[in-house]
Amino acid sequence: MHDRYWVRARHLKAFNWNVVVCFYREKRWCESCKKVRSEWIDWLCPTSPHMTLELCWWINRLSEITSVLQVSKLESIDKMATYKVDKHILQRLLQGYKIPNVTHISVDEVYARSPVQQKENETRDDLFLTVIVDHRTHKVIWVSQSRRKEALDTFFEMIGPEGCKQIKVVTCDQHRGYGESVAQYCPGADLVWDRFHLVQNFNEALNEERKKEWDKYGNPADGDDLLAAKYRYIYLTKSKNRSALDKWHIKEVMSKNEKISYMEFIKEHFHKMFDCTSENEAKEMLNECYEWSVQAKASNLVKYFWSLMERNELWNYFKHKITSGVSEGINRAIKTLKWQAYGYKDMVYFALKIMQKCGYLNSRYALSWLYNENT
């Protein structure tokens, strides 16, 4: 024995009393490392040797329902130590995690960092995380760093060729990198563009046309500001969702501006297109929207509709009638998680927390492999 030192290790409370395990820990010569090392004690936490492993598992369980800060206050443990312990347990759970077999997945990015945290060798794409969700269970099955093509490539490489063959449908937004990754690894899968993002891009084109009309005919000096930016949401809202005042507003503008009348009919027609029961019916309605845009000389809408004409990603929606709405719900949960912790600096830890809160990396699911392994 080279030396020994006194250790006071925190343990789980007993009858609301703090429990501390006190013992001597020896230091001996290690033939493998060729230096003096402290003896290995398997019931101590490797990242925080002043805590027992049982206490670490308990901290991880508590962090499933509240923030690390609140857990540290509840257990009277340093916040940084609580964070390190929680990350260690999550990484240990990740070692035994197996991505489940999936056939329908939703892929979406979530904003993880602000531009202030962007490093010199990074681009804006690196500020995001790519979140993959199973449509059947509505659970997050994987989280990758950035929103590049390589982020989704990592997931497909992990599940292997056999797993890629099982995937039938992938829903995502119009991000080019995701589409290229799906085409490379899952050529037999149908890529479906999300309806929400399609409507969002349509609204942007529609708003640009409103701006043109405002620049051409708007006259705030005479009180004629019905086309002003403060009323832009009236022009983007469906007719059935407008208030009585909004309906009067749009009727007043349509009586004076023929192009706005065209745009109103185009907007309502475009929204109705998603209710079509067949691809041919939807194509006919999109062609009508395109023709009306040409007649109205709405160049932004013409360009937008033309870009959709031959895209199978759009027409696959009418084949499967599926969207990435589940990912939007998950994104709301992720934003709540981020808000609860006042943000994350460690993106690896953030990804693990997403899989803990919204996926299978928690005590309810992920511990089964550990118990089975030890019995």
Placement of each model-derived feature along the sequence:
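Short, positively charged, Gly/Tyr-enriched micro-motifs
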Residues: H2-I105, E109-V116, K165
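Residues immediately flanking
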Residues: S32, E109, H135, Q174, ...
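Acidic/histidine-rich catalytic cores and adjacent linkers
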Residues: D126, E162-P187, F196-V199, N219-T375
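RNase H-like nuclease fold core
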Residues: K84-V169, R176-S181, G188
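Short small-residue beta-strand/loop micro-motif enriched in glycine and branched aliphatics
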Residues: S38-W40, H138-W142, N316-Y317
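Short alpha-helix plus adjacent loop in nuclease-associated cores
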Residues: L198-N219
